[in-house]
Design a protein with these regions (language model features):
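Hydrophobic core positions of the immunoglobulin-like beta-sandwich fold
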Residues: 289, 320-323, 417-420, 465, ...
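Active-site segments of SGNH/GDSL-like serine hydrolases
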Residues: 127-136, 153-188, 211
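Conserved SGNH/GDSL esterase-like catalytic core that processes O-acyl groups on lipids
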Residues: 14, 20-147
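Catalytic His-Asp segment of secreted/periplasmic serine-dependent ester chemistry enzymes
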Residues: 172-271
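Beta-strand-rich modules
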Residues: 322-343, 419-441, 527-550
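Solvent-exposed loop/turn segments flanking beta-strands in beta-repeat/beta-sandwich domains
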Residues: 290-304, 382-401, 479-500, 536
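Short beta-strand segments within Ig-like beta-sandwich modules, predominantly Fibronectin type-III
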Residues: 310-317, 407-413, 501-503, 513-521
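Pro/Thr/Ser/Gly-rich low-complexity, intrinsically disordered linker/stalk tracts
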Residues: 251-294, 327, 342-387, 424, ...
Length: 584
């Protein structure tokens, strides 16, 4: 078809959406399925927009050091829009696949850029699929998201007053831990949108609702239409296109009948990755393999040689760097391509390598102090030998009181730093690693902090000891709001002190569970291997916030009566401490 003739005479359509509409490399996409429907219905359309492809996969790269905190903010990664489609899409579609959809896009972002795109591409009709990211990422609630969609319509009209809109509601996602709010917010938003859309139309610029949600087989425990609980698989692509086609037929008189979903949905090709290799590298062991076209990443399993159990991880590119290894450790690994939660290729053969890392150990003498909005930390450089010069240190912190929190790491130079912008009252776990030209070394933990509570907490109270077996004792005490953690101390009858450690670092502290900020929480620690018996020792508890420590609690001993529990209780033969919370 002659492009100039097509541009002049065709009905111009722009898809405005997020990753659901953008698609990933190897997808057919619902945009292709509705293009096929237009072709079958004899509707001559020209898809317009700034992009033409899907989202291309991540490129493999070695481990990158964390961004330096005193530099300009790390720029966002460039938008990837050059990914290919399924190998069997019609060549004519590849010349007519333009769109304005991008992974991660929110309605509150799209409303600020839509006028420019409409002015540039002059669509006659916008197929709008947005809003999930606003709710799913807690950017805004249902009312605010609805307002963003109305602003999008208004600003698009400012560039083309006669623009038509087919506006989709949002799908239910499969259930997520700690996100009971999401299906509730989804229903509220969809109800608001359905009631509002009729009032958004004008005589020359109609707006019609697309019932994406009710046509999409996803939500709760059902994921028939989605490969990951949200994004469409081959069936889901047909279902979304069908939902839009219903609206185009009924409200815009485009086409004669809605798209019919075929009985046989084409399978996604997913061969086993080829050429897996594992080699020793300065940072540990590097595993690579040939990329699989259309894979949504890879499942990788690894284990130390002669062990039977695999550890699993998911990677987005065809490379994985096994870090934090000791010299001489042999690692085995295997890989399979992933097409989502249920579609997997067969595993590769097992590859192996022996580590000879050249990285530096973690810094020493780390000292932390809570501040009103974060924490301050100081340290000393690690002792040699190690390869190369120290380039920077990585400071990692994790908010244990925020559901869904992720580990954040920033780069620093020197021997001290202050991290700000954290949530007062929340507990943060902290660790550091050293970066040289060889890469990042094995991290070590510093003392955790409760932000905004910098003074040393009071001594723990209500400390009690109870024999569990002849060699194991259970300690309980009242949890403290200002404590980030606790030291457990014991002394023998001669008064010789001993600190019990959970972590193999300078931190002697038992890391407490979430929820212990409540002053009414009771802490519990089980201490095994108190030889020759638990009655030969006295026990005390010390609270801390960073390196600010309380006084020791009173010393306690278990009652002298013999325990009823059997002496062969299943406790590890190490100085580990097991903490639990009893509420009430």
């Amino acid at each position: 078809m002659n492009r100039s003739v097509k541009e002049k005479d065709a009905f111009r359509v722009m898809v405005v959406g997020d990753s659901i509409s953008h698609g990933r490399e190897g997808d057919w996409t619902w945009r292709y399925r509705i293009w096929q429907w237009f072709e079958q219905e004899g509707v001559w359309v020209d898809f317009v927009g700034p992009y033409a492809g899907t989202s291309s996969p991540d490129k493999p790269h070695p481990p990158r050091p964390p961004w330096l905190i005193d530099e300009s903010p790390e720029p966002p990664p460039p938008l990837r829009t050059d990914g290919g489609y399924a190998k069997d899409v019609a060549p004519r579609f590849l010349a007519n696949s333009n769109h304005f959809a991008a992974g991660g896009r929110q309605a509150c972002q799209a409303k600020d850029v839509i006028a420019e795109q409409v002015a540039s591409h002059q669509p006659d009709l916008c197929l709008v699929q947005l809003g999930f990211n606003d709710l799913g990422w807690r950017v805004s609630g249902p009312v605010e998201t609805l307002a963003s969609m109305k602003h999008l319509v208004d600003r698009a009209r400012s560039a083309k007053p006669d623009l038509k809109f087919a506006m989709a509601d949002i799908p239910y996602r499969t259930d997520l831990p700690d996100r009971e709010d999401l299906p509730v917010s989804t229903k509220i938003y969809n109800d608001l949108l359905a009631r509002s859309v009729p009032y958004w139309s004008t005589a020359e610029s109609p707006v019609a609702l697309v019932r994406f949600c009710e046509n999409y087989s996803c939500g709760g425990s059902n994921s028939d239409a989605a490969y990951d609980g949200l994004h469409p698989n081959a069936l889901g692509e047909y279902q979304i296109a069908r939902a839009f086609s219903h609206t185009l037929v009924s409200d815009f008189k485009l086409g004669r009948s809605a798209l019919a979903i075929p009985d046989r949905i084409p399978p996604r090709p997913l061969p086993t990755p080829a050429s897996i290799r594992a080699v020793s590298a300065p940072s540990g062991i590097t595993i690579t393999w040939d990329a699989v076209y259309g894979a949504f990443g890879y499942d990788l399993q690894h284990r130390f040689a002669r062990e039977s159990d695999w550890e699993s991880t998911h990677v987005d590119s065809n490379r994985y760097d096994q870090r934090w290894l000791q010299k001489g450790q042999a690692v085995e690994c295997r890989v399979r391509a992933s097409g989502g939660d249920t579609l997997k290729s067969p595993w590769t053969k097992v590859a192996s390598a022996v580590a000879d890392p050249q990285t530096a150990p973690a810094p020493t003498n780390m000292v932390t102090r809570a501040t009103p909005t974060g924490f301050a930390i100081s340290w000393e450089p690690p002792p040699p030998p190690y390869a190369g010069e120290i380039d920077r240190y990585g400071i990692a912190h994790f908010d244990s009181d925020q559901p869904g929190a992720v580990l954040c790491t920033v780069g620093v130079r020197g021997q001290s730093a202050e991290i700000t912008g954290l949530t007062p009252g929340h507990r943060y776990y902290i660790a550091m690693e050293t970066w040289t030209t060889a890469g990042g070394g094995i991290p070590a933990a510093a003392r955790a902090v409760v932000v905004g509570r910098g003074t040393p907490p009071a001594a723990p109270t209500s400390v009690r000891a109870q024999a569990v077996t002849r060699l194991a004792v259970e300690l309980t005490w009242a949890g403290m709001p200002a404590a980030a953690g606790y030291d457990i101390w014991v002394r023998d009858r001669r008064g010789v002190l001993r600190s019990l450690a959970l972590c193999p670092s300078r931190e002697r502290v038992v890391r407490v569970s979430d929820g212990s900020l409540s002053g009414g929480s009771m802490m519990k620690a089980v201490i095994p291997n108190m030889r020759p018996s638990v009655w030969e020792w006295e026990y005390a508890v010390e609270a801390y916030n960073g390196d600010n420590q309380s006084k020791l609690s009173e010393w306690v001993t278990p009652p002298p009566e013999a325990p009823e529990s059997p002496e062969d209780m299943s406790l590890a033969d190490t100085d580990s401490i097991h903490i639990a919370l009893n509420h009430g």
